[in-house]
Amino acid sequence: MKGVATDIGTIHFIGIGGIGMSGIAEVMHNLGYKVQGSDVAESYVVEGLRKRGIAVMIGHKAENLGDAAVVVTSTAIKRGNPEVELALEKRVPVVRRAEMLAELMRLKSTVAIAGTHGKTTTTSMVAALLDAGGVDPTVINGGIINSYGSNARLGASDWMVVEADESDGSFLRLDGTIAVVTNIDPEHLDHYGSFDKVKDCFVEFVENVPFYGAALLCIDHPEVQAIIPRVRDRKVVTYGFSAQADVRGDNVTPIPGGNRFDVVVRNRDGDTRRIEGVTLPMPGRHNVQNALAAIGVALEMNISDAIIATGFAKFGGVKRRFTKVGEVPVGDGVATVIDDYGHHPVEIRAVLAAAREGARAKVIAVVQPHRFTRLRDLMTEFQTAFNDADTVYVAPVYAAGEAPIDGVDAAALVAGLKQRGHRSAQVIAGPEALAATLAATIAADDMVICLGAGDITKWAAGLSEAIAKETAR
């Protein structure tokens, strides 16, 4: 008799186009479950699911439910949704995304990556090293892994690598055999109520690791370092650039398109050894830090130093993580357009530092603030996050369903940037205005970085062509 049945009937995902939902749906489809779903709009994620044979309906209507035996909902789906209401009326089980992911994780040993920033990139780096080591893991990520062309993959081994989203506390359901915490910053306070509660939940996440597992913690981050004394009965391995790290980055050297660095590994007996010449095809010191987390995981899984040294060679990065999306011919050279998901001040600062590190001319930031509440709560931090940009263009706030807040808008951010000493910041109304402005000012070797979690990615995708059209007028 099979231990896990796949003939339970149709599993219906409400909000299947969300990056977290789509990964679970794809893996379950590949496991043999009958999967379908609905979403509010067409997207590249929806298109990808259909190509893989998963039916997706656009719009939320009760009739979409069909003969579903189980309903899975994303965090964005609330009571009152017609599909949820019909499922409850018919007594069809309704489970949250994290609960379904937790059920999948029961089938395998798991690496769970959590943290306020860097989860998606670190998850993809862990997958890359395990692939290089012949582990062939199942992967469910919060972003499209370029080498997969998807955010999910069903592997043949007993290991799974997952991104653990802390936004609503549901990551506490995800008990990793190996847990990673990249950083802890004050985010999602609308759910948690206070930063202390955020930190408490990360401690609980680490303590959920079994006695035979390990927690990889970034000692460079003060709030992560602060929770280490609270974890007294689990194996903790620290990583970072600190001299106290168990897995330490050393001799970091920027190279075209990325970094080369050494790793100093401290064993339990205090002895150390070096892994020299690790090449990472991603720019930015923060990405070396993410790579150190992945290396720590690989070491825990007994992947050899030789494989670790070369394991990132085929790493193609993650969609919308410092992704080059276009070039603009200018004079005898070109300007580059980059698309990045960064929407928190810490992320923006790291992305712009990486850009400055590799820039040969101006760094031009185009930011679309994401949510009025985030801009309100972190306004001071946003106003000091753009020092590495020569020029900042601030787009209207992407509301993400929120109502506007008086005095919290693009103009307020620009005013604050100028008050804190930024020499060039202005509001930009839309993609057409941006293209027209850049056409008159952009120069060879400039780097334009579009930042945000909203539809700024569409601005980035069409920007090089739009600038070219403006220039040709």
Swiss-Prot record:
UniProt keywords, alphabetically: ATP-binding, Cell cycle, Cell division, Cell shape, Cell wall biogenesis/degradation, Cytoplasm, Ligase, Nucleotide-binding, Peptidoglycan synthesis
Involved pathway(s): Cell wall biogenesis; peptidoglycan biosynthesis
Keyword ATP-binding: yes
InterPro entries according to UniProt: Mur-like_cat_sf, Mur_ligase_C, Mur_ligase_C_dom_sf, Mur_ligase_cen, Mur_ligase_N, MurCDEF_pg_biosynth, UDP-N-AcMur_Ala_ligase_MurC
Pfam families the record matches: Mur_ligase (PF01225), Mur_ligase_C (PF02875), Mur_ligase_M (PF08245)
Biological-process GO terms, alphabetical: cell division; cell wall organization; peptidoglycan biosynthetic process; regulation of cell shape
Function: Cell wall formation.
Protein family membership: Belongs to the MurCDEF family.
Protein name per the record: UDP-N-acetylmuramate--L-alanine ligase
Organism: Rhizorhabdus wittichii (strain DSM 6014 / CCUG 31198 / JCM 15750 / NBRC 105917 / EY 4224 / RW1)
